[in-house]
Amino acid sequence: MDNPLDRYVHPLCDRYASREMQSVFSPSRRFGTWRRLWIALAESEAELGIPISAEALDEMRAAVNELDLEKAAEYERRFRHDVMAHVHLFGDDAPAAKGIIHLGATSAFIGDNTDLILHRDALELIRTRVVRCVEALSAFAEEH
């Protein structure tokens, strides 16, 4: 995890956060989740009869991990909106889907659902560690 985009950066991270937890809240995980949500949205809309081409869906799936955060920052300076910056960036990476990315969605759909997914992943990580801790304490208690 040497790529700075693969870890959440905060002054207290090095002191208190594990690498796994930093990864959960990293920019690449957050913005990759945005793209996966847009893909799920487009797939659902296509199933409901909205004209979304297979080519558009294929391009979106192929570009899900193609994150150029420098270019996203340029778009964000231009639009002054983080979600719209990434809509345009994803459209650059999946040109056939440019007109349908984020179709019918709000920024809250993307941001709120991403937060829920990342917090769920973080809680699963915590749960795993708590279970290990309880098992170790139980073994220690039985031994002593």
Regions of interest found by a model, annotated:
Residues 1-144:
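A helix-coil-helix interface module used to build multimeric assemblies
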